[in-house]
């Protein structure tokens, strides 16, 4: 991992598209942040094409305005049922979504969604390293927002949830598999509390569709650290604290 000053971080966002987003957001009077994996991968010096932008307001309005600002070379796709939009411009794809807060019923992965703040949006993220945000508004361009110590967790190579892991995993059980995936892909260690919660909540994986499980499982098995991560080794062992159903779900999936 590399350490960056705000000025150095700002330079990582010198691509034209970020300047255009900044101008558009300021014109609309909307707060706008790059969030998640793109920010994480800057600090890990990993290539990343997935640019996710959270708007405190309407992500669709922001995308439409940006498309007009960019002109003929821009293609805008709206997904109104999900409150999201995508802008493609000269080989770059940017996903826009309004900041939101979510709550879940125990028997469903479908969240109840409400408009929210950046803080609300970061609270709903799966892991601290994916809750990092960088402001794109001119007055704060390049400012890192890290409420959960995600940068320190990158330094320590730790996977940890921003909130109580029992809440994070119960709300969306697929995050348990994502936890394993990030540990194997990045060669990180799963935080003790997070791992213990994964063990407690693993039966919840049963509400996830087989297709989603298969997708995550493939990513786990293809990860370079799959056979060397001690925490994942524990999960592969049916005699470990993880119930057999989770082991079977992960490693005998057909």
What residue ranges belong to the model's regions?
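Catalytic cores of the polymerase beta-like nucleotidyltransferase superfamily
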Residues: 1-239, 252-254
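Short, intrinsically disordered low-complexity segments enriched in Ser/Thr with adjacent Pro
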Residues: 241-246
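Leucine-biased recognition of intrinsically disordered, low-complexity hydrophobic segments
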Residues: 248-250
